[in-house]
Amino acid sequence: MGNNVVVLGAQWGDEGKGKIVDLLTERAKYVVRYQGGHNAGHTLVINGEKTVLHLIPSGILRENVTSIIGNGVVLSPAALMKEMKELEDRGIPVRERLLLSEACPLILDYHVALDNAREKARGAKAIGTTGRGIGPAYEDKVARRGLRVGDLFDKETFAEKLKEVMEYHNFQLVNYYKAEAVDYQKVLDDTMAVADILTSMVVDVSDLLDQARQRGDFVMFEGAQGTLLDIDHGTYPYVTSSNTTAGGVATGSGLGPRYVDYVLGILKAYSTRVGAGPFPTELFDETGEFLCKQGNEYGATTGRRRRTGWLDTVAVRRAVQLNSLSGFCLTKLDVLDGLKEVKLCVAYRMPDGREVTTTPLAADDWKGVEPIYETMPGWSESTFGVKDRSGLPQAALNYIKRIEELTGVPIDIISTGPDRTETMILRDPFDA
Protein backbone atom coordinates (compact mmCIF):
# COMPACT_ATOMS: atom_id res chain seq x y z
CA MET A 1 0.00 0.00 0.00
CA GLY A 2 1.31 3.45 -0.94
CA ASN A 3 0.57 6.30 1.47
CA ASN A 4 2.61 8.97 -0.33
CA VAL A 5 1.61 9.16 -4.00
CA VAL A 6 3.14 11.56 -6.53
CA VAL A 7 1.19 12.68 -9.61
CA LEU A 8 3.27 14.40 -12.28
CA GLY A 9 3.35 15.05 -16.00
CA ALA A 10 5.31 12.56 -18.13
CA GLN A 11 5.58 14.91 -21.12
CA TRP A 12 5.79 18.70 -21.63
CA GLY A 13 2.90 19.56 -19.30
CA ASP A 14 -0.82 19.89 -20.06
CA GLU A 15 -1.35 16.12 -19.68
CA GLY A 16 -4.51 16.38 -17.58
CA LYS A 17 -3.03 16.20 -14.07
CA GLY A 18 -5.64 18.35 -12.31
CA LYS A 19 -8.54 16.01 -12.96
CA ILE A 20 -6.57 12.93 -11.83
CA VAL A 21 -5.31 14.58 -8.65
CA ASP A 22 -8.86 15.66 -7.87
CA LEU A 23 -10.14 12.12 -8.50
CA LEU A 24 -7.51 10.44 -6.32
CA THR A 25 -7.90 12.95 -3.48
CA GLU A 26 -11.14 11.21 -2.59
CA ARG A 27 -8.95 9.06 -0.36
CA ALA A 28 -6.26 11.60 0.53
CA LYS A 29 -5.97 13.69 3.68
CA TYR A 30 -3.40 16.11 2.23
CA VAL A 31 -2.58 17.40 -1.25
CA VAL A 32 0.79 19.11 -1.66
CA ARG A 33 2.17 21.36 -4.41
CA TYR A 34 5.98 21.14 -4.36
CA GLN A 35 7.27 23.17 -7.35
CA GLY A 36 6.34 25.79 -9.92
CA GLY A 37 4.01 28.70 -9.30
CA HIS A 38 0.91 30.19 -10.89
CA ASN A 39 2.32 29.29 -14.31
CA ALA A 40 0.48 25.98 -13.86
CA GLY A 41 -3.08 25.65 -15.10
CA HIS A 42 -5.03 22.72 -13.67
CA THR A 43 -8.57 22.36 -15.01
CA LEU A 44 -11.17 20.39 -13.05
CA VAL A 45 -14.67 19.57 -14.27
CA ILE A 46 -17.03 18.36 -11.55
CA ASN A 47 -20.71 17.81 -12.32
CA GLY A 48 -20.24 19.90 -15.44
CA GLU A 49 -18.79 22.87 -13.51
CA LYS A 50 -15.33 23.98 -14.64
CA THR A 51 -12.66 25.25 -12.22
CA VAL A 52 -9.17 26.37 -13.28
CA LEU A 53 -6.53 26.45 -10.54
CA HIS A 54 -3.07 27.95 -11.04
CA LEU A 55 -1.48 27.99 -7.59
CA ILE A 56 -3.78 26.35 -5.06
CA PRO A 57 -3.60 22.52 -5.02
CA SER A 58 -6.40 20.65 -6.81
CA GLY A 59 -7.59 19.10 -3.54
CA ILE A 60 -9.05 22.43 -2.38
CA LEU A 61 -12.55 21.54 -3.62
CA ARG A 62 -12.80 18.62 -1.18
CA GLU A 63 -13.80 19.31 2.41
CA ASN A 64 -11.93 16.26 3.75
CA VAL A 65 -8.60 17.44 2.30
CA THR A 66 -5.99 19.90 3.57
CA SER A 67 -4.12 21.57 0.70
CA ILE A 68 -0.49 22.56 1.20
CA ILE A 69 1.80 24.84 -0.81
CA GLY A 70 5.34 23.60 -0.13
CA ASN A 71 8.65 25.47 -0.04
CA GLY A 72 9.50 24.53 -3.64
CA VAL A 73 6.64 26.69 -4.93
CA VAL A 74 7.22 30.37 -5.79
CA LEU A 75 4.19 32.19 -4.44
CA SER A 76 2.60 35.32 -5.88
CA PRO A 77 0.52 36.99 -3.13
CA ALA A 78 -1.58 38.74 -5.79
CA ALA A 79 -2.29 35.49 -7.67
CA LEU A 80 -3.09 33.63 -4.45
CA MET A 81 -5.53 36.31 -3.27
CA LYS A 82 -7.28 36.36 -6.66
CA GLU A 83 -7.65 32.58 -6.67
CA MET A 84 -8.80 32.49 -3.05
CA LYS A 85 -11.46 35.12 -3.75
CA GLU A 86 -12.78 33.24 -6.80
CA LEU A 87 -13.13 30.06 -4.73
CA GLU A 88 -14.55 31.82 -1.66
CA ASP A 89 -17.15 33.55 -3.86
CA ARG A 90 -18.33 30.02 -4.73
CA GLY A 91 -18.63 29.10 -1.06
CA ILE A 92 -15.37 27.17 -0.69
CA PRO A 93 -13.73 27.97 2.71
CA VAL A 94 -10.18 28.20 1.37
CA ARG A 95 -8.60 29.56 4.57
CA GLU A 96 -9.81 26.53 6.52
CA ARG A 97 -8.30 24.13 3.99
CA LEU A 98 -5.03 25.76 2.83
CA LEU A 99 -1.59 25.82 4.51
CA LEU A 100 1.71 27.38 3.36
CA SER A 101 5.40 26.80 3.99
CA GLU A 102 7.13 29.88 5.37
CA ALA A 103 10.04 29.07 3.02
CA CYS A 104 8.00 29.77 -0.15
CA PRO A 105 9.78 32.49 -2.16
CA LEU A 106 7.52 35.44 -3.00
CA ILE A 107 6.85 36.58 -6.57
CA LEU A 108 6.44 40.36 -6.56
CA ASP A 109 5.84 42.97 -9.29
CA TYR A 110 9.51 43.42 -10.15
CA HIS A 111 9.83 39.72 -10.99
CA VAL A 112 7.01 40.05 -13.53
CA ALA A 113 8.58 43.21 -14.99
CA LEU A 114 11.94 41.44 -15.36
CA ASP A 115 10.35 38.36 -16.95
CA ASN A 116 8.60 40.43 -19.60
CA ALA A 117 11.57 42.74 -20.24
CA ARG A 118 13.82 39.72 -20.84
CA GLU A 119 11.43 37.95 -23.19
CA LYS A 120 11.09 41.19 -25.17
CA ALA A 121 14.89 41.57 -25.32
CA ARG A 122 15.32 37.98 -26.56
CA GLY A 123 13.14 38.75 -29.57
CA ALA A 124 13.04 35.74 -31.91
CA LYS A 125 14.97 33.69 -29.32
CA ALA A 126 12.26 34.10 -26.65
CA ILE A 127 11.75 31.01 -24.48
CA GLY A 128 7.99 31.46 -24.35
CA THR A 129 7.60 31.93 -20.59
CA THR A 130 4.16 32.69 -19.18
CA GLY A 131 5.41 36.15 -18.19
CA ARG A 132 4.41 35.63 -14.57
CA GLY A 133 7.79 36.20 -12.90
CA ILE A 134 8.47 32.55 -12.10
CA GLY A 135 12.07 32.40 -13.39
CA PRO A 136 13.24 35.68 -11.81
CA ALA A 137 11.74 34.61 -8.44
CA TYR A 138 13.68 31.32 -8.53
CA GLU A 139 16.82 33.28 -9.49
CA ASP A 140 16.43 35.48 -6.41
CA LYS A 141 16.00 32.35 -4.28
CA VAL A 142 19.23 30.79 -5.55
CA ALA A 143 21.08 34.13 -5.29
CA ARG A 144 19.91 34.26 -1.63
CA ARG A 145 18.35 37.69 -2.02
CA GLY A 146 14.74 36.51 -2.38
CA LEU A 147 11.98 37.42 0.06
CA ARG A 148 9.96 34.56 1.54
CA VAL A 149 6.57 34.12 3.17
CA GLY A 150 8.32 33.87 6.55
CA ASP A 151 9.79 37.37 6.10
CA LEU A 152 6.26 38.79 6.43
CA PHE A 153 6.23 38.04 10.17
CA ASP A 154 8.60 41.01 10.72
CA LYS A 155 7.17 43.87 8.67
CA GLU A 156 9.96 46.40 9.38
CA THR A 157 12.71 44.03 8.32
CA PHE A 158 10.65 43.02 5.28
CA ALA A 159 10.44 46.67 4.17
CA GLU A 160 14.23 47.06 4.49
CA LYS A 161 14.96 43.85 2.55
CA LEU A 162 12.45 44.83 -0.13
CA LYS A 163 14.07 48.25 -0.61
CA GLU A 164 17.48 46.64 -1.06
CA VAL A 165 16.37 44.01 -3.58
CA MET A 166 14.26 46.48 -5.55
CA GLU A 167 17.18 48.90 -5.91
CA TYR A 168 19.14 46.03 -7.45
CA HIS A 169 16.38 44.98 -9.87
CA ASN A 170 15.25 48.48 -10.82
CA PHE A 171 18.82 49.36 -11.76
CA GLN A 172 18.80 46.40 -14.14
CA LEU A 173 15.35 47.22 -15.53
CA VAL A 174 16.14 50.87 -16.24
CA ASN A 175 19.79 50.71 -17.32
CA TYR A 176 19.98 47.39 -19.14
CA TYR A 177 16.48 46.69 -20.41
CA LYS A 178 15.49 50.38 -20.83
CA ALA A 179 12.22 49.56 -19.07
CA GLU A 180 10.32 51.47 -16.38
CA ALA A 181 11.28 51.08 -12.74
CA VAL A 182 8.81 49.31 -10.44
CA ASP A 183 7.35 51.47 -7.65
CA TYR A 184 8.72 50.41 -4.25
CA GLN A 185 5.90 51.92 -2.17
CA LYS A 186 3.21 50.20 -4.24
CA VAL A 187 4.89 46.79 -3.90
CA LEU A 188 5.32 47.31 -0.15
CA ASP A 189 1.73 48.49 0.38
CA ASP A 190 0.23 45.70 -1.74
CA THR A 191 2.25 43.03 0.09
CA MET A 192 1.60 44.42 3.57
CA ALA A 193 -2.14 44.47 2.83
CA VAL A 194 -2.17 40.66 2.61
CA ALA A 195 0.74 39.82 4.94
CA ASP A 196 -1.42 38.77 7.90
CA ILE A 197 -3.59 36.52 5.72
CA LEU A 198 -0.49 34.73 4.40
CA THR A 199 1.23 34.32 7.77
CA SER A 200 -1.99 32.98 9.34
CA MET A 201 -1.73 29.95 7.04
CA VAL A 202 1.94 29.14 7.73
CA VAL A 203 2.81 25.69 9.07
CA ASP A 204 5.95 23.52 9.44
CA VAL A 205 5.27 21.42 6.33
CA SER A 206 8.09 18.91 6.79
CA ASP A 207 6.98 18.14 10.35
CA LEU A 208 3.32 17.93 9.32
CA LEU A 209 4.14 15.45 6.53
CA ASP A 210 6.28 13.34 8.84
CA GLN A 211 3.47 13.14 11.39
CA ALA A 212 1.03 12.24 8.60
CA ARG A 213 3.38 9.44 7.54
CA GLN A 214 3.58 8.08 11.06
CA ARG A 215 -0.23 8.06 11.32
CA GLY A 216 -0.53 6.32 7.93
CA ASP A 217 -2.46 9.18 6.30
CA PHE A 218 -2.75 9.25 2.52
CA VAL A 219 -0.87 12.16 0.95
CA MET A 220 -0.95 13.24 -2.69
CA PHE A 221 1.88 15.30 -4.18
CA GLU A 222 0.71 17.33 -7.17
CA GLY A 223 3.26 18.16 -9.85
CA ALA A 224 2.98 21.10 -12.24
CA GLN A 225 4.23 21.42 -15.83
CA GLY A 226 5.89 18.17 -17.00
CA THR A 227 9.04 16.03 -16.80
CA LEU A 228 10.53 17.25 -20.08
CA LEU A 229 10.39 20.85 -18.81
CA ASP A 230 12.59 20.07 -15.77
CA ILE A 231 15.28 22.72 -15.23
CA ASP A 232 18.02 20.04 -15.05
CA HIS A 233 16.70 17.17 -17.15
CA GLY A 234 14.50 18.93 -19.70
CA THR A 235 15.20 20.40 -23.14
CA TYR A 236 17.42 23.17 -21.74
CA PRO A 237 17.14 26.17 -22.10
CA TYR A 238 13.51 25.63 -23.23
CA VAL A 239 12.49 24.51 -19.77
CA THR A 240 10.74 25.83 -16.68
CA SER A 241 12.68 27.08 -13.66
CA SER A 242 12.00 24.25 -11.22
CA ASN A 243 12.49 20.50 -10.83
CA THR A 244 9.33 18.99 -12.27
CA THR A 245 10.61 15.43 -11.80
CA ALA A 246 9.90 13.22 -8.78
CA GLY A 247 13.12 14.34 -7.07
CA GLY A 248 11.47 17.73 -6.60
CA VAL A 249 8.96 16.19 -4.18
CA ALA A 250 11.51 15.73 -1.39
CA THR A 251 13.30 19.05 -1.89
CA GLY A 252 10.10 21.02 -2.51
CA SER A 253 8.09 19.74 0.46
CA GLY A 254 10.49 18.41 3.07
CA LEU A 255 9.28 14.80 2.81
CA GLY A 256 12.17 12.34 3.17
CA PRO A 257 12.87 10.76 -0.25
CA ARG A 258 12.56 7.17 1.04
CA TYR A 259 8.91 7.81 1.87
CA VAL A 260 7.65 8.27 -1.69
CA ASP A 261 5.65 5.08 -2.32
CA TYR A 262 4.23 5.42 -5.83
CA VAL A 263 4.86 7.80 -8.75
CA LEU A 264 2.04 8.17 -11.28
CA GLY A 265 3.00 9.63 -14.65
CA ILE A 266 0.16 11.40 -16.46
CA LEU A 267 0.48 10.57 -20.15
CA LYS A 268 -1.56 12.11 -22.92
CA ALA A 269 -2.39 9.68 -25.76
CA TYR A 270 -0.57 12.07 -28.12
CA SER A 271 1.97 14.86 -27.53
CA THR A 272 1.61 18.61 -27.01
CA ARG A 273 3.97 21.42 -26.17
CA VAL A 274 3.50 25.13 -25.43
CA GLY A 275 6.12 27.69 -26.40
CA ALA A 276 9.49 27.15 -28.05
CA GLY A 277 11.77 24.11 -27.86
CA PRO A 278 12.39 20.70 -29.45
CA PHE A 279 9.37 18.60 -30.44
CA PRO A 280 10.39 15.81 -32.89
CA THR A 281 6.88 14.40 -33.47
CA GLU A 282 5.21 17.78 -34.08
CA LEU A 283 2.60 17.71 -36.84
CA PHE A 284 1.99 20.64 -39.17
CA ASP A 285 -0.68 18.92 -41.29
CA GLU A 286 -4.41 18.33 -40.95
CA THR A 287 -3.79 15.60 -38.34
CA GLY A 288 -2.02 18.13 -36.11
CA GLU A 289 -4.95 20.50 -36.58
CA PHE A 290 -7.38 17.65 -35.83
CA LEU A 291 -5.61 16.87 -32.53
CA CYS A 292 -5.63 20.55 -31.55
CA LYS A 293 -9.31 20.97 -32.34
CA GLN A 294 -10.54 17.65 -30.88
CA GLY A 295 -8.37 18.01 -27.79
CA ASN A 296 -9.14 21.72 -27.29
CA GLU A 297 -5.42 22.32 -27.01
CA TYR A 298 -5.27 25.85 -25.70
CA GLY A 299 -3.42 26.67 -22.48
CA ALA A 300 -5.45 27.03 -19.26
CA THR A 301 -3.01 29.69 -18.05
CA THR A 302 -2.13 31.65 -21.20
CA GLY A 303 -4.79 30.65 -23.75
CA ARG A 304 -1.97 29.91 -26.22
CA ARG A 305 -2.50 27.27 -28.91
CA ARG A 306 -0.49 24.19 -28.06
CA ARG A 307 1.73 22.48 -30.61
CA THR A 308 0.49 18.93 -31.30
CA GLY A 309 2.04 15.66 -32.50
CA TRP A 310 2.13 11.87 -32.17
CA LEU A 311 3.04 10.19 -28.89
CA ASP A 312 6.83 10.07 -28.48
CA THR A 313 7.71 6.93 -26.53
CA VAL A 314 11.45 7.77 -26.69
CA ALA A 315 10.82 10.94 -24.69
CA VAL A 316 8.37 9.10 -22.42
CA ARG A 317 11.00 6.45 -21.64
CA ARG A 318 13.24 9.28 -20.43
CA ALA A 319 10.40 10.33 -18.10
CA VAL A 320 10.19 6.73 -16.84
CA GLN A 321 13.92 6.78 -15.99
CA LEU A 322 13.95 10.20 -14.35
CA ASN A 323 10.90 9.61 -12.16
CA SER A 324 11.11 5.85 -11.50
CA LEU A 325 7.47 5.77 -12.61
CA SER A 326 5.25 3.14 -10.98
CA GLY A 327 2.39 3.48 -13.45
CA PHE A 328 0.75 5.70 -16.05
CA CYS A 329 -2.59 7.38 -16.29
CA LEU A 330 -3.44 7.64 -20.00
CA THR A 331 -5.53 10.72 -20.79
CA LYS A 332 -7.40 12.06 -23.81
CA LEU A 333 -7.59 8.70 -25.57
CA ASP A 334 -10.93 9.87 -27.01
CA VAL A 335 -9.16 12.62 -28.99
CA LEU A 336 -7.76 9.90 -31.28
CA ASP A 337 -11.27 8.59 -32.07
CA GLY A 338 -11.96 8.68 -35.80
CA LEU A 339 -8.37 8.57 -37.06
CA LYS A 340 -7.76 5.84 -39.67
CA GLU A 341 -4.30 5.18 -38.28
CA VAL A 342 -2.31 6.21 -35.22
CA LYS A 343 1.46 6.46 -34.89
CA LEU A 344 3.94 5.96 -32.07
CA CYS A 345 7.48 7.32 -32.24
CA VAL A 346 9.74 4.40 -31.27
CA ALA A 347 13.21 5.80 -32.11
CA TYR A 348 15.01 8.85 -33.53
CA ARG A 349 17.13 9.13 -36.64
CA MET A 350 20.03 11.47 -35.96
CA PRO A 351 21.44 13.83 -38.63
CA ASP A 352 24.37 11.41 -39.21
CA GLY A 353 21.94 8.54 -39.95
CA ARG A 354 22.24 6.74 -36.60
CA GLU A 355 19.12 5.35 -34.95
CA VAL A 356 18.86 6.06 -31.21
CA THR A 357 16.30 5.16 -28.57
CA THR A 358 17.27 7.77 -25.95
CA THR A 359 16.69 11.52 -25.98
CA PRO A 360 19.47 14.10 -26.37
CA LEU A 361 19.87 16.40 -23.37
CA ALA A 362 20.66 19.92 -24.65
CA ALA A 363 18.19 21.60 -27.02
CA ASP A 364 20.88 22.10 -29.69
CA ASP A 365 21.45 18.33 -29.87
CA TRP A 366 17.83 17.83 -30.98
CA LYS A 367 18.39 19.73 -34.22
CA GLY A 368 17.76 17.58 -37.27
CA VAL A 369 16.35 14.69 -35.19
CA GLU A 370 13.71 12.77 -37.16
CA PRO A 371 11.09 10.52 -35.53
CA ILE A 372 10.88 6.86 -36.56
CA TYR A 373 7.26 5.75 -36.38
CA GLU A 374 5.36 2.54 -35.84
CA THR A 375 1.92 2.79 -37.47
CA MET A 376 -1.14 1.08 -36.02
CA PRO A 377 -4.79 0.90 -37.14
CA GLY A 378 -7.02 3.60 -35.64
CA TRP A 379 -10.63 3.18 -34.51
CA SER A 380 -13.88 4.78 -35.56
CA GLU A 381 -15.87 3.96 -32.40
CA SER A 382 -16.16 6.58 -29.65
CA THR A 383 -14.15 6.01 -26.48
CA PHE A 384 -15.49 9.20 -24.86
CA GLY A 385 -16.87 8.57 -21.39
CA VAL A 386 -16.27 4.79 -21.53
CA LYS A 387 -15.96 3.60 -17.93
CA ASP A 388 -14.99 -0.03 -18.44
CA ARG A 389 -12.00 -1.47 -20.30
CA SER A 390 -14.25 -3.98 -22.07
CA GLY A 391 -16.07 -1.06 -23.70
CA LEU A 392 -12.96 0.09 -25.57
CA PRO A 393 -12.44 -0.83 -29.25
CA GLN A 394 -9.84 -3.56 -29.87
CA ALA A 395 -7.63 -1.14 -31.82
CA ALA A 396 -7.58 1.23 -28.81
CA LEU A 397 -6.68 -1.68 -26.52
CA ASN A 398 -3.85 -2.63 -28.89
CA TYR A 399 -2.58 0.96 -28.79
CA ILE A 400 -2.61 0.93 -24.97
CA LYS A 401 -0.81 -2.42 -24.84
CA ARG A 402 1.89 -1.20 -27.24
CA ILE A 403 2.56 1.88 -25.10
CA GLU A 404 3.02 -0.41 -22.08
CA GLU A 405 5.43 -2.62 -24.07
CA LEU A 406 7.50 0.29 -25.36
CA THR A 407 7.79 2.04 -21.98
CA GLY A 408 7.88 -0.95 -19.64
CA VAL A 409 5.32 0.70 -17.35
CA PRO A 410 1.69 -0.40 -16.79
CA ILE A 411 -1.21 1.92 -17.58
CA ASP A 412 -3.06 1.85 -14.26
CA ILE A 413 -5.67 4.52 -15.03
CA ILE A 414 -7.42 5.48 -18.29
CA SER A 415 -9.21 8.81 -18.61
CA THR A 416 -11.88 9.07 -21.32
CA GLY A 417 -13.27 12.56 -20.67
CA PRO A 418 -12.83 15.71 -18.56
CA ASP A 419 -15.28 14.79 -15.78
CA ARG A 420 -13.92 12.85 -12.80
CA THR A 421 -16.51 10.10 -13.44
CA GLU A 422 -15.13 9.44 -16.95
CA THR A 423 -12.24 7.35 -15.66
CA MET A 424 -11.19 3.70 -15.40
CA ILE A 425 -9.01 2.93 -12.38
CA LEU A 426 -7.40 -0.43 -13.14
CA ARG A 427 -5.03 -0.21 -10.17
CA ASP A 428 -5.43 2.45 -7.48
CA PRO A 429 -2.06 4.07 -6.61
CA PHE A 430 -3.00 4.09 -2.91
CA ASP A 431 -3.47 0.30 -3.05
CA ALA A 432 -0.45 -0.48 -5.24
UniProtKB/Swiss-Prot annotation:
Residues noted as binding GTP in the record, renumbered to the chain:
13-19, 41-43, 306, 332-334, 415-417
Its pathway? Purine metabolism; AMP biosynthesis via de novo pathway; AMP from IMP: step 1/2
Q: Domain of life, per the record?
A: Bacteria
Pfam families (alphabetical): Adenylsucc_synt
Q: Which InterPro entries match?
A: Adenylosuccin_syn_GTP-bd, Adenylosuccin_syn_Lys_AS, Adenylosuccinate_synth_dom1, Adenylosuccinate_synth_dom2, Adenylosuccinate_synth_dom3, Adenylosuccinate_synthetase, P-loop_NTPase
Active-site residues are: 14 (proton acceptor), 42 (proton donor)
Binding locations of IMP? 14-17, 39-42, 130, 144, 225, 240, 304
The cofactor remark states: Binds 1 Mg(2+) ion per subunit.
- Where does the record place it? Cytoplasm
Keywords (alphabetical) are: Cytoplasm, GTP-binding, Ligase, Magnesium, Metal-binding, Nucleotide-binding, Purine biosynthesis
* GO BP annotations listed: 'de novo' AMP biosynthetic process; IMP metabolic process
Q: Which cofactor does this sequence's record say it needs?
A: Mg(2+)
Single annotated GO MF: adenylosuccinate synthase activity
Catalytic activity reads: IMP + L-aspartate + GTP = N(6)-(1,2-dicarboxyethyl)-AMP + GDP + phosphate + 2 H(+)
Residue sites binding Mg(2+) per the record: 14, 41
Q: Where does substrate bind?
A: 300-306
Query: Which Enzyme Commission number(s) are listed?
Result: 6.3.4.4
**Partners and quaternary state?**
Homodimer.
Q: Which family does it belong to?
A: Belongs to the adenylosuccinate synthetase family.
Function field: Plays an important role in the de novo pathway of purine nucleotide biosynthesis. Catalyzes the first committed step in the biosynthesis of AMP from IMP.
**Name of this protein:** Adenylosuccinate synthetase
Annotated source species: Salmonella paratyphi C (strain RKS4594)
The organism that produces this protein has a lineage beginning with: Bacteria, Pseudomonadati, Pseudomonadota, Gammaproteobacteria, Enterobacterales
Gene that encodes the chain: purA
